[in-house]
Amino acid sequence: MAADVHKKKGWEVPNGSLAPGDGQHAERSESPTPGLAQGTEPGAGQEGAMFVHTRSYEDLTSPEDGGAVVRSPEERRGEPAEPTSMEQISKDFSELSTQLTGMALDLEEEMRQSQEGKLEPSPQATRHDSVLSGKEEEDVTMDTWRMHRKHVFVLSEAGKPVYSRYGSEEALSSTMGVMMALVSFLEAEKNAIRSIHADGYKVVFVRRSPLVLVAVARTRQSEQEIAHELLYIYYQILSLLTWTQLNHIFQQKQNYDLRRLLAGSERITDNLLDLMAHDPSFLMGAVRCLPLAASVRDAVSTSLQQAKAKSLVFSILLSGNQLVSLVRKKDQFLHPIDLHLLFNLISSSSSFREGEAWTPICLPKFNSSGFFHAHISYLEQEMDLCLLLVSTDREDFFTVSDCKRRFQERLRRRGVHHALQEALRTPFYSVAQVGIPDLRHFIYKSKSSGLFTSPEIEAPYVREEEKERLLGLYQYLHSRAHNSSCPLKNIYFTGPRENLLAWVTSAFELYICYSPLGTKAGAISAVNKLMKWIRKEEDRLFILTPQTY
């Protein structure tokens, strides 16, 4: 069973990244210089880390999920029990499919009918019949379909369509068949296809048996970054099915139509692709915090910590796609990818605002073999605060629901409701607060904490296409800085509409955008001022004292 669950001492994750080290208790440097050690940079947690350390693309391409990882019983504490059969997973999936489609799908019954050849064409297996899709199909023969800057396709190794970003899977089935034939042909020659570059397009292939994911893009993104996004789609599918169930399905029938089980989930995958096109969290492989006074955040975290139950593994409070607080079980570390998938699930549906939801969810980077159960609810209708309580016990709804009640009581007792409401009125800060005239925007990531901060995108990047263009420039700098063959630590980019600078060290990553009239010397001076400002504001912009049960 693959999992990124680790002890705090004496371990190394399979991809070779470093564990949350005890060195994070070291003295924190007051000088923002390149000599900052990891764990002492602005934004680094002073009392341990919340997340498994990641190395962005390299982490995503670590050994495939499902491989055995030998760990002691102590290391396994807090995880869902290893399923002894498919029955429990099937039962959990039936609950999840009911929430997604309004229809309960029995996996074992599906597989029995499939083997007996009794499956009727499912009206839920096509996107245009899914009432949850919320958008019309595009004609794949029209120029408007071809003009999209990025297409994403998911297919099985048998060439069966699973998902397409635009257009119906039926209309694209022959195209996907050609893609699979190309992959298979090269594999027969004992080779593997990773990408094709032609006429300004990149065609990127990612194979995660039993699935093949393909993107056709004409963006500034590198091959690695496009593969990064495809792997997010793969993990999104695992979060709905589990790795165990996905492999069980195709072991039983190689040409199974997976759309039957994923019907109704297209909007979740669509939403994930939309988020990746606009939110730098995915590019940075990190989580952004809601700017909040340290005293208020500490009161929230303490309230979460005290409203605990035996089965709880993670208690998460979020606003939009920003983290307010996270409390974890001791020695259990959440992965940023799993948190991104939770954010995406919540932002994909407004139904979570209507009451308390109790839904199975797989956290594929934590444990890809089984389901947790997540209690999802908003604290109040008028407040954009969503509470996720992740439990290992599928029968523990009422106990976990009581945790929410106790959490709200403690918030009221501590008198932090008003402060939270004020923070939610301005969920982003202005770059003008930094006090650097030519500075337009920046992204700063603390590597040891797995957190990043950036201001609101303001003029001249007002229109949506301008915001996407700015993110595209950051993607270009990021791809150059993390190029697998020739990574760069410092990049200075000059353009007709803005200048940019990237600075990547072992402790942090910084990307800044400023006026095209600025000079290189001015940019370097701005970096020094900006780092001092981040250090001064770090207790408001980051979670420096993460709590555990």
Swiss-Prot record:
Residues 110-119 have a biased composition (Basic and acidic residues). GO terms for molecular function: guanyl-nucleotide exchange factor activity. It comes from the Eukaryota. Residues 1-90, 109-137 are annotated as: Disordered. One of its GO terms (biological process) is protein secretion. GO terms for cellular component: Mon1-Ccz1 complex. Belongs to the MON1/SAND family. PANTHER family: SAND PROTEIN-RELATED, VACUOLAR FUSION PROTEIN MON1 HOMOLOG A. This is Vacuolar fusion protein MON1 homolog A. It comes from Gallus gallus.
